[in-house]
A protein has these predicted regions:
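Short, small-residue-biased leader/transition segments that mark boundaries at the very start
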Residues: 1-3
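Alpha-helical transmembrane segments and terminal signal-anchor/GPI-anchor hydrophobic tails
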Residues: 7-20, 136-252, 290-310
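Loop-to-helix entry region of an early transmembrane alpha helix in multi-pass inner-membrane enzymes
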Residues: 30, 41-58
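Short acidic/glycine- and proline-prone juxtamembrane loop motifs at membrane-interface regions
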Residues: 88-94
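Transmembrane helical bundles and short interhelical boundary loops of multi-pass, membrane-embedded
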Residues: 226, 254, 274-330
Length: 330
């Protein structure tokens, strides 16, 4: 929510400055700045959020329909795992993810020109979209089980090399090198959490299930590649969780589409129930743990429902934000 609050401040400040002054004062990507400037002239920030949600929802619906998956099931999984933390917190990243989904669809349809076009648009909203290029290029290459260990080993080698180059200062010429160093030092102080280890184990188990599936399809191959790349990042880039946390947003979408299509269509009721319980536990952790600042407004609602005094919600949000910052500094 601290990022979202910054979005709101930038959005509302445009009316007091021209476009070029706004661009110079902001560090966001150019295409997002252009879209923000255009919409700020005609609609309020809340309306802009609504339009972003409608656009993202429509693209997700189209992605589900392409593979014949149920939209409601996919939406439920994404809501528990990623929606509140991306669409409601990092607006430009959510738009970027939607454009990456369009790029993947066009690539699978062998329309390379449109795929490259949507990829360029996604980078214009968030530069991290470049990290999804390997998945895009490999999505039509059949993934064999014999390649898994090799790719995971490559992830470890890449992670160790990246860590060495980062610590040695060889990445200092990169514009966001300070941010990379900040996130890696922050992770080193906090260590690896039990939740992160559980998530790695869960993805490993899901990877095994994907290779046990004998009904080969484009969706299955895409789910295998996205899960494997996420695992390689989790194992190799453990010191930079912000990297694989962003990557998992797309992976969760693809996994949700696969699960919605296969678990429900094939009648895997027990597996579906287990997934539902795990997803609800993940959502409960986000809603109840004060460390997740982006969920403070929803935590306020829960407090009110439980009968406590609602008080000043905005004041409580900034108190939670200050506590979160102090916790990271320590």
């Amino acid at each position: 929510m601290c990022i979202r609050d910054r979005y709101k401040q930038d959005y509302e400040s445009i009316e007091f400055s021209d476009f070029f002054a706004f661009v110079q004062a902001s560090s966001f990507e150019p295409l997002y700045l252009a879209v923000t400037f255009i919409f700020s002239q005609v609609v309020s920030f809340q309306t802009f959020l609504f339009l972003v949600s409608v656009f993202n929802g429509f693209i997700l619906y189209r992605f589900c329909r392409f593979f014949g998956a149920g939209f409601s099931g996919v939406g439920a999984v994404c809501f528990c795992w990623t929606y509140l933390a991306t669409n409601m917190a990092t607006i430009r990243f959510s738009l970027s993810i939607s454009l990456v989904l369009l790029a993947v669809l066009c690539w699978l349809e062998k329309d390379k020109f449109k795929s490259i076009f949507y990829t360029c648009l996604s980078v214009g909203f968030h530069s991290f979209s470049l990290a999804f290029m390997p998945l895009l290029l490999l999505s039509r290459v059949e993934l064999k089980a014999s390649m898994v260990f090799l790719i995971l080993s490559g992830g470890v080698v890449f992670g160790l090399s990246f860590s060495y180059l980062l610590d040695s200062g060889l990445f200092s010429y990169i514009p966001f090198s300070e941010k990379l160093l900040f996130y890696s030092e922050k992770s080193a102080r906090s260590g690896i959490s039990i939740g992160s280890l559980f998530y790695v184990a869960l993805n490993g188990f899901f990877m095994i299930c994907l290779f046990r599936d004998r009904f080969e399809s484009v969706l299955l191959n895409l789910a295998r590649w996205s899960t494997l790349i996420l695992l390689a990042l989790q194992v190799g880039m453990w010191f930079l969780p912000v990297f694989w946390n962003r990557y998992q947003v797309l992976t969760v979408l693809i996994q949700a589409v696969y699960i919605s299509f296969n678990f429900v269509r094939r009648g895997f009721m027990l597996e579906t129930l287990v997934l539902m319980l795990i997803s609800l536990l993940v959502l409960a952790k986000f809603l109840l743990d004060p460390a997740f600042v982006s969920y403070v407004p929803y935590q306020n609602v829960i407090s009110e429902v439980l009968g406590t005094d609602r008080g000043d919600g905005e004041r409580r949000f900034y108190e939670a934000l200050d506590a979160h910052i102090d916790r990271n500094v320590k």
